[in-house]
Amino acid sequence: MVIGLFFLKAVPSYSADKNPAGVTGFTYSITFPDNQVKKDLGYFKLKMDPGKNQQISITLSNPGTEKVTIDVKLNGAKTNQNGVIEYGESTIKNDPSLQFDFTDIVTGPESVELAPGETKNLDLTIQMPETSFDGVIAGGIQLMRANQNGTSSNEGGSKIINQYAYVIGVVLQESEKVIAPDLKLNSVKAGQSNYRNAIFVNYSNVMAAYLDNMTVEVQITEKGKETVLYERKQTAMRMAPNSFIDFPVSMNGERMVAGDYVANILVTSGDKKWKWTKDFSISDKDANKFNERDVGLVQEKGLDWKLIALIVVGILALIILIFVIIRIRNKKKQEKELALKKERKKKKQQGSSNGKSSKKKD
């Protein structure tokens, strides 16, 4: 059974300050404070002062006839491997360039209970850093009904439980000053994406600014050779402030081979361009490990020709053994029948001889 979490977003790429109860069992509306930069965004974008403490509110309503418990989680903005910004809960770690963590700055209750027909405010506290900064701090407020049964579906023989949550974006800034994003290459290494062999290009947006309309082009070659083994181009990607991306380049279902390689990487966004050439190696240990885990290769290994050959040889050996046993038995049977015939013939000859002797005596 697989549990999938779907986010119904109100973040810097989507706006919705009111919503139907739908599958979540509750509704919310945003109460914008005076320092909201724009009140038609559907998410919080606040201009703050260093060290300022402020409370923001989200109005929660339960239109149903049963009590609803809403789990509240606060998450810093991250970038997933598809170049999509995640404001909901994720396993992606913080980038080392992150100076101020959203979850240290924004705090609030872990859950809210609503009786049938009740409306209540979810109050969150923002404590801005004492040190001033340029750029933005970004994150999300995740609202999810506790003990959610979700909707189920069957795909590929597996039961999938779909659960739903609202995610409301929060962007904090101290000025209107626009800073440019900047990228730093961290590593290129072998790994797996969705249990299939891949090469991962890991790089960071080290500035407190969004990077939009990003295009990534990667080509992988064997060191000292020009033939492109694997390549990928992806457009219309984004990066969160002070976040990294693990960009996978598929090995197209091929076995991973140990050796020395070169990654040629080009990232563009508008008139900005970053270009890197990075040598990397794949060890025998890693190649064997990932090949054993690659689901495509495991399925191919279902036709294990060595095993099939052993089975065929075993069957042939069994057939030969049975044939030899039958031949031996038939030979023994024939020898026995031949011996009986000889014995009968001998007795018949002896009987004839005895008859002739009797006639002579008479």
Task: Show where each model-derived region lies.
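Membrane-proximal extracellular "stem/stalk" segments
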Residues: Q173-L310
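Cytoplasmic C-terminal tails of single-pass
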Residues: K331-D362
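Sec-dependent N-terminal signal peptides of Gram-positive bacterial secreted proteins and lipoproteins
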Residues: M1-S15, A309-R327
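Terminal connector regions
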Residues: E66-K93, Q127-E176, R255-D294
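Intrinsically disordered, low-complexity Pro/Gly/Ser/Thr-rich segments with frequent PxxP/GP/PP motifs
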Residues: I92-S132, T221-M256
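A surface-exposed loop-and-adjacent beta-strand signature within N-terminal beta-sandwich domains
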Residues: K18-F26, I30-D34, N75-T119
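Short, solvent-exposed loop/turn segments enriched in Ser/Thr/Gly
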Residues: D40-L41, P50-S57, T119-L122, D134-G140, ...
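Beta-sheet-dominated interaction scaffolds and their linkers
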Residues: I30-G64, V68, S111, D182-N194
